[in-house]
A protein has these predicted regions:
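Catalytic pocket-lining loop regions of alpha/beta-barrel enzymes
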Residues: 8, 132-133, 148-221
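Mid-domain alpha/beta scaffold segments of enzyme catalytic cores
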Residues: 2-158, 162
Length: 221
């Protein structure tokens, strides 16, 4: 996509897709990590630059339309959740997501959670909208440098317990400098998964494997 305009699909993008991905991407697509948003759900003037540069409302149909510009003629569904941000009205964002999925039986949604949400809040939202999982994010940790947050700081055990009770998935975008190679991350992932076997933990972005060396170091843990 063109520098300075992440929302514009260029001929370079299309050529890259044809060269590298056309033979790999299946005829039917399920996007397992897709965000939706409304600008109105962010505090005034606080929407991140990527969101501010895009449409005022990016729901499921808009996401599909944009992807079809790059990947035409392939039916698409997905696992959707709101765009996490500290200024986000999470209740409004979750309601928007729930409404978006009412007429998309092939797609699923995850509830955007903050550490302050009670088990009852989660139960009620999941029951109301039929969400299949939870989406936590480090920006909701109660510290200034949230990239150093432990998993427990933005995914407390009480919420993992609810996911286990309801058989929900959790999408975890872990942080800390070495990601999967971080001992604290390893210990928490093992403890949560062994203690709550009905909870399915999705380690987002290939276990945040942006540095392959960290993934190699931590994958056997």
């Amino acid at each position: 996509m063109a520098a300075g305009n992440e929302w514009e699909v260029t001929e370079w993008d299309r050529e890259l897709f044809q060269r590298e991905l056309e033979s790999f991407v299946p005829e039917r697509i399920f996007d397992a990590h897709a965000h939706v948003y409304r600008v109105q759900d962010f505090a005034a003037g606080q929407a991140p630059a990527f969101v501010a540069a895009g449409p005022a409302v990016a729901g499921v149909a808009e996401v599909e339309r944009r992807l079809q510009e790059l990947i035409p003629d392939r039916p698409m569904e997905g696992l959707y959740f709101p765009y996490p941000h500290r200024s986000m009205n999470t209740a409004a964002a979750n309601e928007f997501l729930g409404q978006e999925l009412q007429h998309r039986p092939g797609s699923r949604g995850q509830l955007l959670i903050t550490p302050e949400m009670s088990p009852e809040d989660i139960h009620n939202a999941v029951r109301r909208w039929g969400f299949v999982g939870l989406k936590c994010y480090h920006v909701y940790a109660a510290r200034e440098r949230t990239f150093e947050a432990t998993i427990e700081e933005y995914l407390p055990e009480s919420q993992v317990r609810v996911a286990d009770e309801l058989g929900l998935s959790i999408t975890l975008h872990m942080v800390r400098a070495t990601a999967l190679a971080d001992v604290a991350n390893q210990q928490t992932i093992r403890r949560y998964c062994s203690s709550y076997p009905r909870m399915r933990l999705i380690l987002a972005h290939a276990a945040r494997g942006f540095n392959p060396h960290h993934t190699v170091l931590g994958i056997d843990s």
